[in-house]
Amino acid sequence: MKLFYFSLLFTLFFGLISANRGPKVTDTVYFDLQQGDEFLGRVTIGLFGKTVPKTAENFRALATGEKGFGYEGSIFHRVIPNFMIQGGDITKGDGTGGKSIYGSRFPDENFKLSHQRPGLLSMANAGPDSNGSQFFITTVKTPWLDGHHVVFGEVLSGYDIVKKISKAETDNRDKPLEDVKIIKSGQLSQENVEDDGTDEL
């Protein structure tokens, strides 16, 4: 009987550890951001390529620009305090455009991950199966988005920059009065990634 209880406790303990780890980060990308004339710094983002491989690969390739187009030079066109910051419209810059590496749009991959905390990366869309290049980063828990938007990454460092952007002064369309621009983007090797941002969330 003692052996049974020991085995049960062992299973529960390591189950909790595994659950706390969350989805595996397979790739890390970065955005160097500028607001108006002010350089804000670098945000690094981990992508959950095991859980949502197609969605993660789309974002990774757009961050590197290896397909001939991508996020570099684009802006965060929509900012709502206590909700999220949205960017990735690489064709029009106003929330009506964007395109993926698979064509104009691609389907929702899955909804395995929930919008359970700030600092999560999720696909913006115009309805079911309409993913392109637009994305948003949460600044609060947003459970009402579960089942509608695909979560596929998290901020690893630079969340303080995300919070600063979320407080930017905006017009009546939620667009920052000063452009918040991705002046450089790319991919980091996993060996050189310092996961120091999760403590900020």
UniProtKB/Swiss-Prot annotation:
<comment type="function">
    <text>PPIases accelerate the folding of proteins. It catalyzes the cis-trans isomerization of proline imidic peptide bonds in oligopeptides.</text>
</comment>
<dbReference type="GO" id="GO:0005794">
    <property type="term" value="C:Golgi apparatus"/>
</dbReference>
<keyword id="KW-0732">Signal</keyword>
<dbReference type="GO" id="GO:0006457">
    <property type="term" value="P:protein folding"/>
</dbReference>
<dbReference type="Pfam" id="PF00160">
    <property type="entry name" value="Pro_isomerase"/>
</dbReference>
<dbReference type="InterPro" id="IPR024936">
    <property type="entry name" value="Cyclophilin-type_PPIase"/>
</dbReference>
<dbReference type="InterPro" id="IPR029000">
    <property type="entry name" value="Cyclophilin-like_dom_sf"/>
</dbReference>
<dbReference type="InterPro" id="IPR002130">
    <property type="entry name" value="Cyclophilin-type_PPIase_dom"/>
</dbReference>
<keyword id="KW-0697">Rotamase</keyword>
<keyword id="KW-0325">Glycoprotein</keyword>
<dbReference type="GO" id="GO:0005788">
    <property type="term" value="C:endoplasmic reticulum lumen"/>
</dbReference>
<dbReference type="GO" id="GO:0016018">
    <property type="term" value="F:cyclosporin A binding"/>
</dbReference>
<keyword id="KW-0413">Isomerase</keyword>
<protein>
    <recommendedName>
        <fullName>Peptidyl-prolyl cis-trans isomerase B</fullName>
        <ecNumber>5.2.1.8</ecNumber>
    </recommendedName>
</protein>
<dbReference type="GO" id="GO:0005783">
    <property type="term" value="C:endoplasmic reticulum"/>
</dbReference>
<dbReference type="GO" id="GO:0003755">
    <property type="term" value="F:peptidyl-prolyl cis-trans isomerase activity"/>
</dbReference>
<keyword id="KW-0256">Endoplasmic reticulum</keyword>
<feature type="region of interest" description="Disordered">
    <location>
        <begin position="174"/>
        <end position="201"/>
    </location>
</feature>
<comment type="similarity">
    <text>Belongs to the cyclophilin-type PPIase family. PPIase B subfamily.</text>
</comment>
<dbReference type="InterPro" id="IPR020892">
    <property type="entry name" value="Cyclophilin-type_PPIase_CS"/>
</dbReference>
<dbReference type="GO" id="GO:0005737">
    <property type="term" value="C:cytoplasm"/>
</dbReference>
<dbReference type="GO" id="GO:0034975">
    <property type="term" value="P:protein folding in endoplasmic reticulum"/>
</dbReference>
<feature type="signal peptide">
    <location>
        <begin position="1"/>
        <end position="19"/>
    </location>
</feature>
<feature type="compositionally biased region" description="Acidic residues">
    <location>
        <begin position="192"/>
        <end position="201"/>
    </location>
</feature>
<feature type="short sequence motif" description="Prevents secretion from ER">
    <location>
        <begin position="198"/>
        <end position="201"/>
    </location>
</feature>
<feature type="glycosylation site" description="N-linked (GlcNAc...) asparagine">
    <location>
        <position position="131"/>
    </location>
</feature>
<feature type="domain" description="PPIase cyclophilin-type">
    <location>
        <begin position="30"/>
        <end position="187"/>
    </location>
</feature>
